[in-house]
A protein has these predicted regions:
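Local sequence-structure signature of Cys/Sec-based thiol-disulfide redox active-site neighborhoods
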Residues: 1-38
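Thioredoxin-like thiol-disulfide oxidoreductase module
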Residues: 28-51, 57, 75, 79
Length: 83
């Protein structure tokens, strides 16, 4: 599975909420942060069909908005747990 990419803006409250969630759940080493202030990440986000942040690319699908991103990260976290 591809490493999920979190497209965000530093000054945006909803992006900050998602970044805090990632840190609080100790997923920093499992999620790639992509600041769309820079052309590379902005171009990659556009290439996935998006422009709004926060957004999460899971390798297959783009999830947009803090609630959708956190829900997808929770699902990925559940998949990574062993029984």
């Amino acid at each position: 599975m591809a490493i999920p990419e979190l497209f965000h803006r530093l000054e945006e409250e909803s992006s900050a909420r998602v970044r805090r969630w990632v840190v609080d759940h100790e997923l920093v080493d499992r999620v790639r942060f992509r600041n769309v202030l820079y052309p590379g990440p902005a171009g990659d986000l556009a290439g996935h069909g998006g422009s709004a942040t926060p957004a999460l690319w899971d390798g297959t699908r783009l999830f947009t908005g803090a609630e959708a991103v956190i829900a997808r990260l929770e699902a990925l976290l559940d998949l990574g747990r062993s029984d």
